[in-house]
Amino acid sequence: MKFNTALLHGDFQGEPNTGATTTPVYQSSAFAHESAEKLEKIFHNQAPGYSYTRISNPTVDAFEKRVTALEGGVASVACASGMAALYNAFCNILRSGDEIVSSASLYGGSIDLFRDLEAFGITTHYVENNDLAAFEAKTNEHTRLYFAETIGNPRLDVTDITALANLAHEHQIPLIIDNTVATAFLVKPLSLGADIVMNSSSKYINGHSNSISGIITDSGRFKWDVEKYPGMADFKKFGPFAYTAKLRNGLFRNTGACLSPQNAFYNCIGLETLGIRMERICDNAAELARFFVREYPDVTVNYPGLESSPWHEIAKKQFRDRFGGILTIRTGSKKRAFEIINALKLPLIISNIGDTKTLVIHPESTLNVHSTPEEKRDAGVFDDLIRISVGIEDVEDLIEDFRQAMDQSKPEKSEE
C-alpha cells in the first residue's frame, strides 16, 4: 500500500464489539480481571492484557501500533511528551559513565536535557556538521549511542542516516534518530539503518496543536551486547522486543512517562491526515522559500529544498521528492526580526512546529535561551534568525502577508 492508504487502513482494527470506526478513548486508570491468576500472568508478561494505564492502555496501544506500522519497526512506546520520549529512549540503555556522541545541530530542549544528564554521569560529545570523521574521532570505549536529528531544528541540516548508521554499527553501538521534523512522510530512518527512531508526536503526527506527546519505535535489529549494556541481560529472551520490553517494564513505568488516553486519541485522528498535510506543508514551504530568495536578496534563506542549501543533495537522495515544512530567514538584526514577526497577520507567534497553521518564532530569545553562545552557533541559532513552520494555508496569502511584513521592516546588521 502507498503512504496515505497505509495510514488509513494498514493497521486499522476498529472496535470489534460495537463497530466503531474510530479508536475509543479508554479513560480508565486501571483494568479489572476475572481472577487473581489472570492479573498475575499479566504482571509477569505471561499473558496479554492491561493492568494500569501508567504501563499500557488500549487507546495508547492503538496509537503505538499505528506508528510502529508507519515507521516499519517491531514495537513502540508512547510517552507524555517528546522530551519524555527522548529521555526514555536514552536512559533505557545508559548508566553513569556512559557517553553519547551527538550531532551539535539539535533542538534547544534536547541540548538542555543532555546538560541535565551530566548530573547522572552521562557525558555528551557534540559533532559539528554531522561530520563522520568527527563522530569516529569522538567515539571511545565508553560510547554507548549515536544521536542525530534527520533535519536539524532550526539549522535544517540533513543527516546522512545510512552513513551514520554504518559507522555506529562498526562500533557495535545503536543509532537513535529524532525524526520529528522530517516525519515518516519524507523518510523512514529504520529503513536506512537507524536502530531506534523517536518523534515528538505533538508536532506533525498530531498536526493540530491539541496535545503533547512523544513516541519511541524500535527496529528490533540491534544485537545488545550485555557487557556494554548490562541492563539488557534480563531482556535478551524477548528477542527483537528486548529494548521495548525493558523500557516498558522499567524506566518508562517507573518515571510515569505515560501518554494520556485522550491525547493518544487525538494523535490517532491526526495521524490519518499526516500524508496530505505534509504534501501541502512541504509545497507551501518550498514556494515561500523561493519567494524570499526571489524578492528579498538582503535576507539569508535556509531551506533544504533550495539548491543553495549545503544539504540539498543528501536531502534529494534521502527524501520523497519534498524537503520538509520548516525554513529560516536571517534578517540582519534582532530588531528587524522582531519587527517582521510583529507585523505578520496570519502566522502565530508560537513555540511549536507542525501545526496546520503557519507558526513563527525567534529561537535565540526563546527555545535556545539556556544555550551557550557556542551551542547556539552549532545549532544554527543567531540573533537575527526567524524560524517559520509553514502551514496549509493558501500560499498566496502567506506570501502577501510576509511581503507586507518584510516591507515594513528596516535592514540592519546582525550581532554574531
Q: What is the predicted function of each stretch?
A:
Residues Y266-I276, G324-G332, R387-G391:
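Short, well-ordered beta-strand elements within core beta-sheets of diverse protein domains
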Residues A30, D218-F222, T331-K335:
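Short loop segments at secondary-structure junctions
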Residues R115-D116, T124-H125, E141-R144, K335, ...:
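PLP-dependent enzyme catalytic core of the Aspartate aminotransferase-like
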Residues M1-A47, E415-E416:
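N-terminal glycine-rich, Lys/His-bearing helix-loop that initiates the first secondary-structure elements
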Residues K2-N4, G10, P58, G354-D355, ...:
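Positively charged, small/polar-rich N-terminal and surface patches that mediate targeting and assembly
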Residues L7-P16, S76-Y296:
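Conserved PLP-enzyme active-site core in the AAT-like
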Residues T255-A257, M278-S351, D355, S371-R377, ...:
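Conserved small-domain helix->loop->beta segment predominantly found in fold-type I
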Residues A30, S35-Y87, G109-D116:
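Conserved N-terminal alpha-helix of the aminotransferase class I/II PLP-enzyme fold
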